[in-house]
């Protein structure tokens, strides 16, 4: 059930349901201005757990960030900070609604965990179009995020959601085969390690065996606590998937590498000299 609170100048909808085309319910947190109105939306959709505090999931990175860039702490309590997504305390005062969605099988959203899959991309499309129809939305949906939350922007943009207005892609690979899994045709172990270390610990169904949210004391990975066997049935084996699809022409990769010619919305893309090279060259 959605809980609504008024905190830090924002109206916040916690764990709001979004129904997918197959009937599955995803869960979203919505940060909006307190004043009733129709606002542009900044959306993220992904696997890292919308209730997982930056300081709990990535403490070394947090400590480095606040040491090197103390201005991050200015004008924000930082208690809504999550990994690689926008801080609503910086965007909502400027007249935006920030929507964070736990992807299928991750965090508070049930279902089968399969990152970057066509099903996940379709869900993202559905979320964009859902947000455009809400009473607090002006129908213009922007996407903004880093890494995972950037990669899946390329993917969903290929589907051309009618209400997708613009994207801010920060360090987001486009070609998951060449830029992520098989560097120069040689298998890279990063993807499997990332899935094991960053996705599975946020899988829905961990319940009391997972993280607790600082913001409310509830469980980051849902109220239910499933057995290890049940959790295994509810997720893909990404390392196996990538190793068994060795060629870029395999259907697995073709379903995950978007066609740039079908992406028509304005894009701001930035990255360091690595990873996202294809998107710059195109």
Language model features: what each stretch is:
Residues 1-37, 41:
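N-terminal cap/lid segment of alpha/beta-hydrolase-fold proteins
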Residues 24, 41-44, 92-99:
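A fold-wide structural signal in alpha/beta-hydrolase
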Residues 51-55, 59-77, 81-88, 93, ...:
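Accessory cap/linker subdomain of secreted extracellular hydrolases
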Residues 82-83, 93, 115-135:
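Alpha/beta-hydrolase active-site loop
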Residues 88, 92-108:
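Conserved alpha/beta-hydrolase
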Residues 135-148:
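Alpha/beta-hydrolase fold nucleophile elbow
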Residues 263, 269-271:
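Short beta-strand/loop motif that positions the catalytic acidic residue
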Residues 275-281:
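Conserved alpha/beta-hydrolase "acid-adjacent" motif
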């Amino acid at each position: 059930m959605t809980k609504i609170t008024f905190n830090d100048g924002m109206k916040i909808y916690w764990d709001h349901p979004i129904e997918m085309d197959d009937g599955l319910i995803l869960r979203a947190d919505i940060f909006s201005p307190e004043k009733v109105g129709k606002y542009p939306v900044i959306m993220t959709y992904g696997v890292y757990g919308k209730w997982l505090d930056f300081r709990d999931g990535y403490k070394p990175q947090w400590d480095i960030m606040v040491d090197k860039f103390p201005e991050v702490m200015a004008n924000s309590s930082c208690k809504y900070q999550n990994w690689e997504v926008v801080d609503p305390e910086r965007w909502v005062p400027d007249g935006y609604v920030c929507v964070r969605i736990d992807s299928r099988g991750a965090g508070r959203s049930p279902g089968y965990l399969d990152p970057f899959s066509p099903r996940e991309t379709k869900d993202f499309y559905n979320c964009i179009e859902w947000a455009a129809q809400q009473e607090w939305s002006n129908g213009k949906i922007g996407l903004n995020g880093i890494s995972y939350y950037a990669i899946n922007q390329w993917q969903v943009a290929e589907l051309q959601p009618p209400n997708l207005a613009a994207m801010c892609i920060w360090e987001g690979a486009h070609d998951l085969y060449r830029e992520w899994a098989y560097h120069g045709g040689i298998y890279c172990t990063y993807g499997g390690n990332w899935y094991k270390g960053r996705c599975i610990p946020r899988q829905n169904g961990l319940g009391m065996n997972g993280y607790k949210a600082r913001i409310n004391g509830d469980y980051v990975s849902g109220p239910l606590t499933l057995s290890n066997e049940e959790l295994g049935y509810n997720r893909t084996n990404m390392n196996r998937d990538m190793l068994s699809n060795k060629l870029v022409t395999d259907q697995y990769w073709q379903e995950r590498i978007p066609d740039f010619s079908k992406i028509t919305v304005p894009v701001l893309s930035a990255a360091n000299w690595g990873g996202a090279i294809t998107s710059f060259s195109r």
